[in-house]
Amino acid sequence: MTKTLVFGHKNPDTDTICSAISYAELKKAQGADIEAVRLGELNSETAFVLDYFQVTAPRLVQTVANEVSEVALVDHNERQQSVDDIDDVTVTAVVDHHRIANFETSDPLYYRAEPVGCTTTILLKMFRENEVEVSKTVAGLMLSAIISDTLLFQSPTCTEEDKVAAQKLAQIADVDIQSYGMEMLKAGADVSKKTVAELLLDAKEFNMNDNKVEIAQINVVDVNDVLSRRAEVEALMTQNIVDKGLDLYLFVITNILTNDSVGIAIGSKTAVVEEAYGVKFVENQAPLKGVVSRKKQVVPILTDTFAK
């Protein structure tokens, strides 16, 4: 039997890690030889989740073609967000909830993408469709992913399907959604011990009308906890622009209590962000009122503005 590795995007978040583990458990129950791995360091929120449910973190890998010939992707499809040697392996399956871009295969594959708030919402359907029982531990991981991606149902990406899935998973995991959810989000929002690199850990690269754009996001309970370190943050953003040849680096600092954000933008195309949101950046900083979702409120808006 051919072994498969399953993983989410680089700079993994809670959905990416928990989806990879959950997908692997589903496929193992069906007899597959599969292992969940990760493409980067865990953030503090995900570390809290794995510790809470006593789950070992997936193994960290830099490449995959040296181990397997087939892989499955969760929570992403764009090549620049995936493993560096993705072109050297066959993608046999994708389960995702993002736009489809910069993705093609030479062979047929299982591809499932739905416009929901979280990948594990889709995975819960797959468990049920295949009549595979969701364990208490996996239910906890899947619930955590939904809470994370929907900001405890406050994000505009959240759908009724996500809410229903979360209720079902909470029953299996035997946790109270509100109390556990706030504890989890606050664990991720504590930036007091984070390095500057860790502040920018949740970053994704996009191609927008032939422009290289990187968008990082962090959830906090007080944006000043990050803005007080703005000089260090901007220095690292500038270095990333040089190292990766970026046209724009946007850092979205989201207050999970007010559901507003502040943006820091650096690069030759910062005017695009100003046009997209009708704001003016002063010393690289501007308010982004009501913006909490990179997927729904940042990527599509910037993509459309770059295309003008």
Curated annotation (Swiss-Prot):
Molecular function terms, GO-annotated: inorganic diphosphate phosphatase activity; manganese ion binding
Family affiliation: Belongs to the PPase class C family.
GO cellular component: cytoplasm
Transmembrane annotation, as ranges: none
Gene transcribed to yield this protein: ppaC
Subcellular location per the Swiss-Prot or TrEMBL entry: Cytoplasm
E.C. code: 3.6.1.1
Catalytic activity, as annotated: diphosphate + H2O = 2 phosphate + H(+)
Keywords (A to Z) from UniProt: Cytoplasm, Hydrolase, Manganese, Metal-binding
PANTHER family, sorted: BNIP - RELATED, MANGANESE-DEPENDENT INORGANIC PYROPHOSPHATASE-RELATED
Protein name stated in the entry: Probable manganese-dependent inorganic pyrophosphatase
Cofactor: Mn(2+)
InterPro entries in the record: DDH_dom, DHH_sf, DHHA2, DHHA2_dom_sf, Mn-dep_inorganic_PyrPase
Cofactor note: Binds 2 manganese ions per subunit.
SUPFAM superfamilies: DHH phosphoesterases
Pfam families found in the cross-reference section: DHH, DHHA2
